Amino acid sequence: RIVRINGDGSIRLILDDVAKDSSGNSIKTAFNTNKDDNAYVGYMYGTPGSTTYDTTHENKNDSTIKIAVDRWYEDNLKTNYANYLSDTLFCGDKTLAESGIGSNNTSTGYGVNITYYSSIERLIYSTGTTDITTSTPTLKCAEKVNDNYSRYTTTKSTLPDGKETNGNLKYPIGLLTADEVAYAGAYKYNQTNKSFYIYNNNITIFWWTLAPISFSGANALILRVNNSSADLYYNYVNTSYAFRPTVNLKYNVKFTGTGISADPYKIVTE
């Protein structure tokens, strides 16, 4: 399903269903098997137990979910569709929220220090733990910082705003940000909207986004989508949920079809 047109002209697509194995069973995975360090909010992460933000969040290790997403790509897209995919960035925003967000926020992002990440101040809290009235999602990625830990691509590159991507992905595949899900119409916890654009009534289980939300002092948390109520909320990274793989089609890909359900777009392979 088409999510949006990216800034480089490529077309972002999300799988209409959750990822499934060869037997047709939904693939469920933890975001990270471990949850007891700030490092584990990352789609990729550095060294748990570190005493600096940089060593915690540099992209040295694959998350549990990244391994599952990459395996799905190898099984379903690598052989026949790799040439049609664009290396457009995926954003796992590990930048820190302002110090006034959350409760006892240290704004450090390492070890077991209580830390809140930027997605929470755009989508969940306005100040402290006060629920936000109007969400402010963004399609820009980690624009406040110069480090590239949040901007995932397969090849390191410089964006139009001068920020760099990290080139740490193995394949040009990822997940949606919580901001993209919010733009599609999903609401925050307990605010149901089953008419949101990427809602699928056949999905009955939760699915992960790329968005770090916080480290509570004991647990790393990521935003996920409750498809039953069509809302955004967070849970521990070691919880097993489904995922919906997301890719970007090159701007010049040829296709047939009119885009309606009876005549969907189909890539013309050569």
Set out the residue ranges of the language-model regions.
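Long, domain-scale functional regions
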Residues: 1-270
